[in-house]
From Swiss-Prot:
Region Activation loop, residue ranges: 706-730
Reactions accelerated catalytically: a 1,2-diacyl-sn-glycero-3-phospho-(1D-myo-inositol) + ATP = a 1,2-diacyl-sn-glycero-3-phospho-(1D-myo-inositol 4-phosphate) + ADP + H(+)
Segments of skewed composition (Basic and acidic residues): 125-134, 267-276
Name assigned to this protein: Phosphatidylinositol 4-kinase beta
Keywords recorded for this protein, A-Z: ATP-binding, Endoplasmic reticulum, Kinase, Lipid metabolism, Membrane, Mitochondrion, Mitochondrion outer membrane, Nucleotide-binding, Transferase
Residues covered by the PI3K/PI4K catalytic domain: 554-820
Pro residues: bias regions: 277-288
Gene Ontology CC, one term: cytoplasm
Segments for region (Catalytic loop): 687-695
Length: 835
């Protein structure tokens, strides 16, 4: 049976009005207890229309002159019903409650009866007072109906992580917040990870009930993953930095961060031997089980670790661990496996330290030389149980090809781009770390002693990342079978790769190729001839003022092939090449926010089948002034294009992709239009500023990609608000589209309209990402009280599609004719040399 409300019928009310009463009791309540107040008059017990057993003790009695009207309810049933209601939702406030301890009759609207104390006269309920009672009952019924619908929504398939975050942020009911916190376990890890900044920001800056709902999930995931633990620690530190120093020291975010970094959240049963794979821990006890939530829907992850071939025969050597401890006083003496977080933290700290030291050097040439030297020394600490957090697969870092690193363009700082060789593995936490392959086995090298000092002692060169040694003689390295494979394959590599790059010499990149014979298969010759017959994109010349241009222009696949041929690990089938940009002195929290909005809009446009193209790139926030960025491969800035080619954009397109009517040019033109429309909408919605040609990339397929979202929403360069147009649309962009009268330009405007209609259909998904991050934030993009309101207004929810079309036409026309865009480009050319 459904829920039944215990209420006075109209018949009973009429009898109360007509008949005198000797009782002043007009309340219906549970027997009072020391701690319990009045209870809502709702119950999930069966209907009382046919009466309950008279032998049960009465809950309360209403007696009126003509006889006694008894309402008898089983006490245990009533208590159980109230407990169920309180545990499920706790929505009702009990507007019609009456305290049984009071002798004064209280009406349903909460006011005392005016005749209650008048000479002991019985209370009378007038017709005017019946209406408020009825309205209260109607509200209670509506609330009950809303609760039912809310529970059905929470348990439906439509309830996704975006809705969960929204209810967690907006709900003020602890019961609902606890329920949502429990439901986090039922979502995929990747889906929750996308909203990790929002979850942790709510944990830091919102009330205690929200924090209590979020913490069990965060703690559980930290026990399962080193990578998740470190990302939580980094984000907690970054988002707590806006608090006052005295408050920050004792905040919940700081306490949780210290708990994570203390490594107290490691799995309860440490694996001393790795022959036996451990199943995932049991699902933690829920705070509030919701109806319909099955156990299988709440299991956090179905993936279990499956052993690699190396793990089958390898166990941790305790003597090896003790040996490491003796050589490194920082390592705590323990017979358990080494501290989980230390190697990765030391690796990231080393990369950040390089960036800080580069910023102190005056010229770009000195920065480049220092970068190559520092990275070559870093290689002596590899391989290790370290990884790049921006990658999408598990791996171990084995080598950094130092001669390929470049310093990027920056006026005051020294961001740099590195390429990282990794070996893909099944689980970087449990898979064996690869054995170090000395470079002398397969190539000629210069001795370590010939390296520039860079302020690093020989002892530091030989040391490793805290607990992770060089693994040359470590038991936890390769299995016997793996070593056998190496011994079989190494001679082949040695004889066929005589033109490999010298390890520490930039000059030998070109000199080694002519010194030794190269053996090439006939199939390779045929393949290279066919590739030469095809159209080959141009290359950039070396520019001492911009060394990154040549590296970024080189096709990615060609770079991978070249670096693999020169790597001692390149023969291994699980070898992969990754790249990352390291930034020091920059706050990447706004970049992370922009990435989330771009990713959400990309998903929306894909769902709505709008062919807009954007490229969100991953952002890793390490602290409030450092982080890592995923590079966009096969792309160079429009500034570099114009500087290197000295051509207009349309002429460069013809040079790269052929004449106007070729299939390659038409494909590149369509890619340009779809990406330009997508980023124009992004720039309008987020009010992206600082749109000079150094911050707009052009890839090998014709797409444009906007980078550097340091000025969005309420912030602008130097807070001047100089760029007033909705987005950047220059005459060169229009020329690539075929001119104002071309079909592709009309296609561009049509895509703008379709994209805006689709975006406003899902506006709340975008708004909540930004709104939650505004809590407790001191970021420049949130300056002013109207940031969120202005963002909502740019979705134009009140306009018809015809009015939206007029708006798009006006924005396009205004952006093309914007004088401030031309002035800002001129300002950047005069001050920074950006073309």
């Amino acid at each position: 049976m459904g829920d039944t409300e215990l209420e006075l019928s109209p018949t009973h009310l009429e009898e109360l009005q007509k008949s005198p009463s000797t009782s002043t009791t007009s309340s219906l309540s549970l027997p009072s207890s020391p701690s319990s107040g009045p209870h809502p008059l709702t119950s999930s017990s069966p209907s009382t229309s046919e009466g309950l057993p008279t032998s049960s003790p009465p809950l309360d009695v209403i007696s009126e002159g003509l006889g006694e009207l008894s309402l008898v309810i089983d006490t245990e049933v009533a208590k159980k019903a109230c407990q169920e209601v309180l545990q499920k939702v706790k929505f009702l406030k009990g507007d019609g409650e009456v305290s049984s301890a009071s002798s004064e009759p209280i009406l349903a609207n909460g006011t005392a009866h005016p005749e209650a104390n008048d000479g002991g006269q019985p209370p009378k309920i007038s017709e005017e007072e019946v209406e408020p009672i009825k309205s209260v009952r109607r509200r209670q019924k509506n609330n009950s109906s809303k609760q039912s619908w809310l529970l059905r929504l929470f348990e439906s398939k439509l309830f996704d992580i975006s809705m969960a975050i929204s209810y967690l942020y907006n709900s003020k009911e602890p019961g609902v917040q606890a329920y949502i916190g429990n439901r986090l376990f039922s979502f995929r890890n990747e889906d929750v990870d996308f909203y990790l900044p929002q979850l942790l920001n709510m944990y830091i800056h919102m009330d205690e009930d929200v924090g209590d709902a979020i913490k069990p999930y965060v703690v559980y995931r930290c026990r399962q993953s080193i990578n998740f633990s470190l990302q939580c620690a980094w984000l907690l530190g970054a988002y707590s930095s806006d608090m006052h120093i005295s408050t920050q020291r004792h905040s919940r975010g700081t306490k949780l961060r210290k708990l994570i970094l203390s490594d107290e959240l490691k799995p309860s049963s440490q694996r001393i031997r790795r022959e036996v794979p451990q199943p995932p821990p049991p699902y933690p006890p829920p705070l509030h089980h919701g109806p319909g939530m099955s156990e299988h829907s709440l299991s956090p992850s179905k993936r279990t670790h499956q052993r690699s071939k190396s793990d089958a025969t390898v166990s941790i050597s305790l003597s090896s661990n003790l040996k490491r401890t003796a050589s490194n006083p920082k390592v705590e003496t323990s017979q358990d496996e080494p501290v989980r977080l230390t190697p990765q933290r030391e690796f990231i700290k080393s990369l950040m330290g390089i960036g800080k030291r580069l910023a102190t050097l005056p010229t770009k040439e000195q920065k480049t030389q220092r970068l190559i030297s520092e990275l070559s020394l870093l290689n002596h600490k590899l391989p290790a149980r370290v990884w790049l957090p921006t990658a999408a697969f598990d791996h171990h870092v084995v080598r950094v090809p130092h001669t390929q690193a470049v310093v990027l363009n920056s006026k005051d700082k020294a961001p740099y781009l590195i390429y990282v060789e990794v070996l893909e593995c099944e689980n970087f936490e449990t898979s064996s770390v690869p054995v170090r392959i000395p470079e002398t086995q397969i190539r000629s090298t210069r001795s370590v002693e010939n390296l520039p000092d860079c302020g690093i002692t020989p002892d530091q060169r030989a040391s490793s990342f805290s607990t992770v040694p060089n693994y040359d003689n470590d038991d936890e390295a390769w299995s016997v079978d793996d070593i056998g494979e190496l011994q079989v394959e190494l001679p082949e590599i040695h004889t066929n790769s005589c033109d490999n790059i010298s390890q520490f010499s930039v000059d030998s990149i070109t000199s080694q190729e002519s010194k030794e014979p190269i053996f090439i298969a006939a199939g390779d010759i045929r393949r290279r001839l066919s590739e030469q017959l095809a159209h080959t994109p141009t290359t950039f010349r070396k520019d001492p003022e911009d060394p990154s241009a040549v590296a970024l222009k080189e096709p990615w696949q060609e770079k991978v092939r070249r670096i693999r041929e020169g790597s001692p690990y390149g023969h291994l089938p699980n070898w992969r090449l990754l790249s990352v940009i390291v930034k020091c002195g920059d706050d990447l929290r706004q970049e992370l926010l922009a990435y989330q909005v771009l990713k959400q809009l990309q998903i929306i446009w894909e769902q709505e089948r709008v062919p807009l193209w954007i490229k969100p790139y991953k952002i890793l926030v390490i602290s409030s002034d450092s982080g890592m960025i995923e590079p966009v491969v096969n792309a160079v800035s429009i500034h570099q294009v114009k500087k290197q080619s000295q051509l207009l954009l349309l002429d460069y397109f013809r040079q790269e992709h052929g004449n106007f009517n070729t299939e390659e040019f038409l494909t590149a033109q369509r890619n340009f239009v779809q990406s330009c429309a997508g980023y124009c909408l992004i720039c309008y919605l987020l009010q992206v500023k600082d749109r000079h040609n150094g911050n707009i990339l052009l890839d090998s397929e014709g797409h444009i990609i906007h980078i550097d979202f340091g000025f969005i929403l309420s912030s602008s360069p130097r807070n001047l608000g100089f760029e007033t147009s909705a987005f950047k649309l220059t005459s060169e962009f229009v020329d690539v589209m075929g001119g104002l009268d071309g079909d592709m330009f009309n296609y561009y405007k049509m895509l703008m309209l379709q994209g805006l209609i689709a975006a406003r259909k899902h506006m709340e998904k975008v708004i909540q990402i930004v709104e939650i991050m505004q809590q407790g934030s001191q970021l420049p993009c949130f300056h002013g009280s109207s940031t969120i309101r202005n963002l909502k207004e740019r979705f134009h929810m009140n306009l018809t599609e015809e009015q939206l079309q007029v708006l798009v036409e006006q924005m396009v026309d205004g952006s093309m004719r914007s004088i401030t865009t031309k002035l800002y480009d001129g300002f950047q050319y005069l001050t920074n040399g950006i073309m």
